């Protein structure tokens, strides 16, 4: 797998911090560390073993930890993240395309 998921995780955290700041939602640093850990675990798996998208992981975590159903979209977290998610999707599609040959 060529895709660098660590960059994607970093952009998710950066975008979420900005989103929370803009919307005056306060969390401690442990919140971000735990989310980063969950994202790293899921996204380090081979594509065929990943059961959730990064956005699903993010929103599920927020719902469970903050008891808020915010349904944050990648667009709300910045264009860099949007681009990285597109690349992640392309890499995932390539993975499955290669497996079908």
What are these regions, as identified by a protein language model?
Residues 43-53, 89-91:
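Short amphipathic alpha-helical segments at helix boundaries and their inter-helical linkers
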Residues 1-32:
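Short terminal alpha-helical segments
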Residues 4, 8, 30-35, 50-54, ...:
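Residue-level detector of well-ordered alpha-helical segments, enriched
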Residues 33-44:
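Amphipathic alpha-helical segments that form the core helices of the histone-fold
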Residues 20-29, 47-52, 70-72:
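Charged, low-complexity interaction regions
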Residues 65-101:
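Amphipathic alpha-helical binding modules
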């Amino acid at each position: 797998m060529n895709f660098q998921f660590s960059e994607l995780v970093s952009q998710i955290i950066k975008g979420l911090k900005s989103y929370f700041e803009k919307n005056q939602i306060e969390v401690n640093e442990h919140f971000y560390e735990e989310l980063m850990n969950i994202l790293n675990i899921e996204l380090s798996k081979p594509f065929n073993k990943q059961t959730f998208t990064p956005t699903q992981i993010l929103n599920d975590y927020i719902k469970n930890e903050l008891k808020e159903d915010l349904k944050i979209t990648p667009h709300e977290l910045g264009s860099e993240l949007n681009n990285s998610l597109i690349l992640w999707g392309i890499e995932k599609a390539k993975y499955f395309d290669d497996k079908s040959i």
